[in-house]
Regions:
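Histidine-acidic metal/acid-base catalytic patches
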Residues: 3-15, 20-116
């Protein structure tokens, strides 16, 4: 609703794959709806446990315990990244996962695989 009240190039969206999913949205549909406002994207996967506890709640999650590709949101992440590539988006993607060295390595590997 916010975007309907303001016509400004300065009002932008920071999209988050995990928060869109947890809130009960289809992340790709949500991204497509607001693509023209997108300035930044957080790429976050979500564990099965968190999904069971919070899916459909009007909330966001600060970070995730699972690496990208290791949770239930992996397919949505793939679809969103593919859409961003198809639409020639050139903004910033931020990986969001709690930082064990292994989680970070797996997340970067997963995202690199999608970006080629």
């Amino acid at each position: 609703r916010l975007f309907t009240h303001f016509d400004s190039k300065h009002l932008r969206l920071n999209f988050d794959t995990g928060n869109a999913f947890i809130a009960g949205n289809d992340p790709l549909e949500y991204l497509q709806r607001f693509r023209k406002y997108l300035s930044h994207a957080h790429v976050k996967d979500v564990s099965q446990e968190l999904t069971a506890a919070a899916r459909g709640e009007d909330t966001g999650i600060a970070c995730s315990e699972v690496p990208l590709g290791g949770g239930v949101n992996a397919e949505n992440i793939k679809r969103c990244v593919e859409y961003l590539k198809e639409t020639d988006w050139s903004g910033v993607l931020s990986v969001e996962c709690y930082g064990s060295d292994e989680n970070i390595r797996k997340s970067i590997e997963f995202l690199r695989g999608l970006l080629v």
